[in-house]
Amino acid sequence: QYLTNGLVINPAYAGTREALSANLSYRKQWARINGAPQFQTLSLHSPVNKKEKVSLGLMADYLTYGVTKDVGIYAFYAYSVRLGHGRLSMGLKGGFDLSNTNYNRLQFPDGNPADPLLTGDMKYTLPNMGVGFYYYTDKYFAGLSVPSLLTYKRDEADQFRVSPDYSLFRTYLTAGTLIRFADVFKVKPSVLVRYSMHEPLEVDLNANLIFADMLWVGGSYRIAEKAAVALLDLQVTPQLKVGYSFDYQLGHLNNYTSGTHEVSLRYEFAFAVSATSPRYF
């Protein structure tokens, strides 16, 4: 999702499209596996004035997996300044994660749960916040973000309490550039690095071929997940872009799933190209 909507991982991305940008996406992970994750996202973000220094945004996401349903609702604030040949955006986000796990929907071989605690519902609402930085020009971009700054632990009373633990942070580093071979042909390579002290380092290598600013054909390789991704986007109008991606597992999961599908739609109101427009990013 971050390839078409950087707001998903970096709050500083808010307003960098220099238009009111509406994004909608749906991701069905690991098709053919019962209870596999399905993820939906709706977001809006835009500069609030012509000087484009302050930007605001909203995002809601809905995740289902197994017997659990998660909802996230977040607001975004970003402030950008001119720096060198581009702009540096600094962003914050704040909101809530709501989760509901219905253990009564679990199915057991003998019809009864082995653990009496695996009955009823577990519901909780937890506030969270994130921070990010994003620098972009018309030729390249770079971003650094920590989408979730608050970490929680469950106590003996089954209540969640804030438990600061920097080792649980997930830090995202992104970078990319635009290589122009001709007016009708461009290449956009990029990379995403996800780091957490208790998880393997994740690296995504991405590349897009852009034809006449209308057709985007690309691919991605996720090293940690051992997954190859095919990407296809169509810029229907200067305002409307639709996309599709297919993830193919190269590891042991390939024996159980037919892949992951994702569709996305972006519409930008009053879109206008400027010298530092990040329309390719």
Q: How would you name each of these model-derived features?
A:
Residues 1-281:
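Subset of outer-membrane beta-barrel
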